[in-house]
């Protein structure tokens, strides 16, 4: 498949997975009964409060559906790009991609289960941590519940600026940012996910040797939470879609080889990184600084081996 067609496929599916994740997060937040959650927190029933949030796999069905649809679309596109093979005088062989083939079905089942398990387990740990920290700090049960769920937007009806949906690490970063705002710590101006539109407000407080008031800190903190959730959605979309699309492309080639439409030695794979700061050094273009594998070419059944053998 041509490189531009492949990038178009990625550009088409990443936004869909991003939105599927955000929809799942908002659905979880909106489905929680606030009064019941507050009651459980007030009673100190942490385990029951975590369960009340309702992190069942069904809430993420749109993500698994998107994964399946993207996988099939990539397989179909790859197969269409493979030229038919001449098998006899006047006859050619041109097969269709089979997303129900055992290897394809096994991959989709494994990847879907792993994706949802990783998200839900991290969320449960994060929710528990928020609840425990809230109770230990003496915050009111309703305030703790609101930290998790966010507040309902009067226009959209959705609960926004909650901690649900963020990773545990992101939740910790958010707490640190809130502390920096409250104490006038200059480190608040170095947070990558902050909204720079509020920098002057923060600088004024620092110059006056004070922290931001609760009212002053509300908007920059909410903007930080909003951006953090988008970063989380972007990361999931990028990882899951690229992984699924590459796996589907590989499976399509294997199906074509098995059917006799292609010979294995006709296929070469080239490692292409994003070539930005997020790419690990061993996956970059090899130069005087990096001994990476970007640009390396291998056959269909050959492994890419980095200098560190990872």
What are these regions (language model features)?
Residues 213, 220-310:
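Acidic, glycine-rich two-metal-ion catalytic cores of nucleic acid-processing enzymes
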